[in-house]
């Protein structure tokens, strides 16, 4: 990477040198309006989304009760990634998050790849979200006459408006979205535990271990289905790294981030693993479906009135939350890239309310293409973009772990200082996590229908990234030459 980028980062790590130069040119101008409660609930919201409320049904049917093990394993590695990112945040808080760290530890090419792969993840996830919102809205008969693409466009417009107002409004919206999701899960788990304890029948089935032992055991379809659902399981955890982006807009990241990151592990265990275990004990896995929330399947099985309506509203909330987070994070990431020259200049523009609206609007533009996808192939839109998004998040996590490896190596050389909040077991933890993530991509090849197509996208994306780099490298070099840190006074 350029010497200037390193110098800038080192100045940020040692503010006594000059307290006026930000660590990343893209960090300047942000408000610090996100409070501890916002970041804590953003961490929760990132761990609970449509991947659980809707996706768990189809995965439970395909993989059986062993899905809980898949969520646990992926959850542990997701925690390692966020722990590593949390350590980097405490070393140097930045709204550019891992893109800023990639710039420091991997150079401008690393930052370029990290940023655009993250944009690929969230822009395609945004398409998936507005597609999901349209599908969920069609659940109610009053909306069935409205075309899916119209509903998708309305959802995008509403969330865009919220993001353009201020970061405080974003934080409040995410706070209440998370409250709804957590309250729903807690309520369901209490009902599920009651059904289990009282042996109350669900759809004519008696809850208990018999739902597992009498229906093929933990692996009713073997190991391979569990391996194949791992891609979707990782996608379920895709917003956890949002904590690192949000840290750049908090007044006290050194107090807030460790608490938020450390709470992720037990939330994963409770909400994902606990919920899936409970679902497996309440009904045979074969009775769940990818077309219906597993929670609706259970609640409808005990005759709860309007169970489908309530859960559909919650899943709708989860999709809106994901779209909200995607616009927020890509706006900040693209601004960091624009200030370094690797993204269009207009994505670096800030509004008077300190919102990087240029990057947000670019993400929305891609989502509008998704509206077109909803118009052309409404039945396939969700599946198409989900595969692309999964590659984006896996590459982002790999880059975070590589950045942390370089960071630790420099710390051992005495070039930087590690904070007290650390990823344990380095460098083994990073290497094992990277190996796991790459293995997930490789094993997708065994899924001929979907996974193989996803893997074949890798060289296509690589060619696009290389072509894009040749298009921006001169501007990146020029920008690096312009942004030399101010001399000490």
Curated annotation (Swiss-Prot):
Disulfide pairings: none
Official protein name in the record: L-asparagine permease
UniProt source species: Streptomyces coelicolor (strain ATCC BAA-471 / A3(2) / M145)
Location in the cell: Cell membrane
One Gene Ontology CC term in the entry: plasma membrane
Cell membrane found in the keyword field: yes
Entry membrane topology: Multi-pass membrane protein
PANTHER family per UniProt: GABA PERMEASE, L-ASPARAGINE PERMEASE
Annotated family: Belongs to the amino acid-polyamine-organocation (APC) superfamily. Amino acid transporter (AAT) (TC 2.A.3.1) family.
Keywords: Amino-acid transport, Cell membrane, Membrane, Transmembrane, Transmembrane helix, Transport
Spans traversing the lipid bilayer: 38-58, 62-82, 113-133, 150-170, 175-195, 223-243, 268-288, 302-322, 357-377, 382-402, 426-446, 452-472
Location (main, coarse): membrane
């Amino acid at each position: 990477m350029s010497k200037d980028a390193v110098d800038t980062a080192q100045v940020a790590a040692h503010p006594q040198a000059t307290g006026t130069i930000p660590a990343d040119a893209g960090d300047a101008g942000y408000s610090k309006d996100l409070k501890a409660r916002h970041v804590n609930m953003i961490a929760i919201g990132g761990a609970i989304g449509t991947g659980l409320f809707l996706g768990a049904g189809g995965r439970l049917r395909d993989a059986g009760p062993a899905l809980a093990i898949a969520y646990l394993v992926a959850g542990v590695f997701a925690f390692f990634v966020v722990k590593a990112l949390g350590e980097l945040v405490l070393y140097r808080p930045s709204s550019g998050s891992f893109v800023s760290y990639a710039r420091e530890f991997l150079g401008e090419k690393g930052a370029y790849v990290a940023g655009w792969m993250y944009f690929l993840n969230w822009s395609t996830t945004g398409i998936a979200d507005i597609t999901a919102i349209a599908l969920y809205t069609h659940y109610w008969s009053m909306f069935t006459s409205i075309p899916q693409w119209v509903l998708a466009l309305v959802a995008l417009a509403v969330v865009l408006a919220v993001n353009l107002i201020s970061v405080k409004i974003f934080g409040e919206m995410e706070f209440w979205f998370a409250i709804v999701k957590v309250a729903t899960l807690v309520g369901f788990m209490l009902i599920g535990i009651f059904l289990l304890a009282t042996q109350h029948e669900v759809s004519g089935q008696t809850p208990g271990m018999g739902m597992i032992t009498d229906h093929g055991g933990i692996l009713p379809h073997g190991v391979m289905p569990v391996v194949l659902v791992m891609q979707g399981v990782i996608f379920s955890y895709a917003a956890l790294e949002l904590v690192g982006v949000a840290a750049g807009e908090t007044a006290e990241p050194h107090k807030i981030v460790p608490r938020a990151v450390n709470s992720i592990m037990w939330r994963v265990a409770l909400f994902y693993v606990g919920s899936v275990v409970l679902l497996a004990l309440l009904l045979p896995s074969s009775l769940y479906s990818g077309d219906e929330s597993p929670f609706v399947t259970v609640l409808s099985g005990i005759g709860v009135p309007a169970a489908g309506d309530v859960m559909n509203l919650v899943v709708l909330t989860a999709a809106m939350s994901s779209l909200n987070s995607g616009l927020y994070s890509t706006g900040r990431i693209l601004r960091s890239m624009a200030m370094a020259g690797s993204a269009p200049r207009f994505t670096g523009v800030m509004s008077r309310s300190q919102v990087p609206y240029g990057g947000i609007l670019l993400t929305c533009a891609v989502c509008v293409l998704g509206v077109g996808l909803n118009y052309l192939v409404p039945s396939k839109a969700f599946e198409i973009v989900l595969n692309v998004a999964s590659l984006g998040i896996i590459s982002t996590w790999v880059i975070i772990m590589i950045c942390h490896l370089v960071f630790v190596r420099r710390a051992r050389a005495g070039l930087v200082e590690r904070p007290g909040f650390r990823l344990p077991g380095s460098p083994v933890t990073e290497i094992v996590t990277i190996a796991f993530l790459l293995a997930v991509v490789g094993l997708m090849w065994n899924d001929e229908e979907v996974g193989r197509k996803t893997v074949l996208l890798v060289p296509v994306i690589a060619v696009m990234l290389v072509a894009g780099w040749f298009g921006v490298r001169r501007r990146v070099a020029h920008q690096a030459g312009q942004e030399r840190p101010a001399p000490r006074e």
